[in-house]
Every structure is written in structure tokens, then in C-alpha cells.
Amino acid sequence: MKIRASVRKICEKCQLIRRRGRILVICSNPRHKQRQG
């Protein structure tokens, strides 16, 4: 899980979702997981 100021999709399978007021990226590739800090 990378914590970044700006999150973006890295590949086609990345999905931007909002959980509890945070923006997350979930993907089939675990390296692409991100959270906005």
C-alpha cells in the first residue's frame, strides 16, 4: 500500500474507489494499491 498525495490509475485494472472519505486504488496487481494521505 503506497500512501500518496495524488493517487491515479497505473494500469487498466486499477479502480478508484472512496471508502470512509479516503480515495483508494485497488487492483489485481498488489503493487498498484494506493491510498490518499
UniProtKB/Swiss-Prot annotation:
<dbReference type="GO" id="GO:0006412">
    <property type="term" value="P:translation"/>
</dbReference>
<dbReference type="InterPro" id="IPR035977">
    <property type="entry name" value="Ribosomal_bL36_sp"/>
</dbReference>
<dbReference type="GO" id="GO:0003735">
    <property type="term" value="F:structural constituent of ribosome"/>
</dbReference>
<keyword id="KW-0687">Ribonucleoprotein</keyword>
<dbReference type="InterPro" id="IPR000473">
    <property type="entry name" value="Ribosomal_bL36"/>
</dbReference>
<keyword id="KW-0934">Plastid</keyword>
<comment type="similarity">
    <text>Belongs to the bacterial ribosomal protein bL36 family.</text>
</comment>
<dbReference type="GO" id="GO:0005840">
    <property type="term" value="C:ribosome"/>
</dbReference>
<keyword id="KW-0150">Chloroplast</keyword>
<dbReference type="GO" id="GO:1990904">
    <property type="term" value="C:ribonucleoprotein complex"/>
</dbReference>
<keyword id="KW-0689">Ribosomal protein</keyword>
<protein>
    <recommendedName>
        <fullName>Large ribosomal subunit protein bL36c</fullName>
    </recommendedName>
</protein>
<dbReference type="Pfam" id="PF00444">
    <property type="entry name" value="Ribosomal_L36"/>
</dbReference>
<dbReference type="GO" id="GO:0009507">
    <property type="term" value="C:chloroplast"/>
</dbReference>
